[in-house]
Amino acid sequence: MIMVQGEVSGKKYTEPFSKGVLARSLTRAEMDPNRAYTFASRIEAHLKKNKVDLITIEELVEIVSEHLRKEDPEVAEKYMLWRKIRQCKEPLIILIGGASGVGTSSIAFEVANRLGIRNMISTDMIREVMRKIVSRELLPSIYESSYTAYQSLRIPPPPELDEVLIGFRDHVESVSIGVEAVIERALTEGISIVIEGVHIVPGFIREDLVNKENVAMFVLTVSDENVHKGRFYSRCRQMWARRPLKRYISYFWAIRRIHRYIENQARKHGVPVIENIDVVTTIDSIIKSLTKTTVKGGEKGAEKTE
């Protein structure tokens, strides 16, 4: 039996080599599952041929990378990027923001899956919890959608100000308290998590949190209004969808105004703005950005997979 040796908090451990675990890590680099398992079987055969009984994770990764570079350089690059992120000592907190309909939920799910992050939460869920705790009288804005929050304003703003954005900012300020609580808890517990939603707006989450090296924020945009509107038609035609298309279309003008505001906030605060047209391209952009700005290297304390 081939044993793989790793290290956790300075203590070494060994576990049996698993083709399934290795294959799963390869699928995170976008290798087809069947092909990944076949490749993992070849790695196992290679180790047996060389009569390897014990191998460190680092040595195994080097062998896998060498074989990948010969077979598929593109997958090899993605695999090494994934490995680099996995080696981060601290929990990884990824924040993905953007106006309704730009695809934050879909991208968050794919990014979490690619990185092997088990925890993901929508800011809409955080807002829903807050609704159960705080009454409508105290925080009327959170009982509205992000694009209708202006309707809850008790005092109408001056004509020269944009009431949609004033309502939206009030809405985001309230929900950001819940978002900050989730981030703080994840950091305390050492849990990696992806948080997505319209309430992830640069400038609204405490700087001491977003400036941490292991916290990364991204904003998604869709410049073409017709493409953006088409996303709502696509979303609402699903059988499980419960959100009425008519409501989105009726307030599309407000959604686009919020879209521009979030994008401007991102550029103002130096947050990466990603045009979300192609899912694969968007995910690759996020992964590459993480390796450049967030991951500083070093073995992750709880690393236990190939």
From Swiss-Prot:
Residues 1-90 form the ATP-cone domain. It catalyses: (2R)-2-phosphoglycerate + ATP = (2R)-2,3-bisphosphoglycerate + ADP + H(+). Keywords: ATP-binding, Kinase, Nucleotide-binding, Transferase. Its cofactor is a divalent metal cation. Catalyzes the phosphorylation of 2-phosphoglycerate to 2,3-diphosphoglycerate. Involved in the biosynthesis of cyclic 2,3-bisphosphoglycerate, a thermoprotectant. This is 2-phosphoglycerate kinase. Coiled coil: none annotated. Its EC number is 2.7.2.16. Belongs to the 2-phosphoglycerate kinase family. GO terms for molecular function: ATP binding; kinase activity; phosphotransferase activity, carboxyl group as acceptor. The keyword Transferase applies. Pathway: Thermoadapter biosynthesis; cyclic 2,3-diphosphoglycerate biosynthesis; cyclic 2,3-diphosphoglycerate from 2-phospho-D-glycerate: step 1/2. PANTHER family: P-LOOP NTPASE DOMAIN-CONTAINING PROTEIN LPA1 HOMOLOG 1.
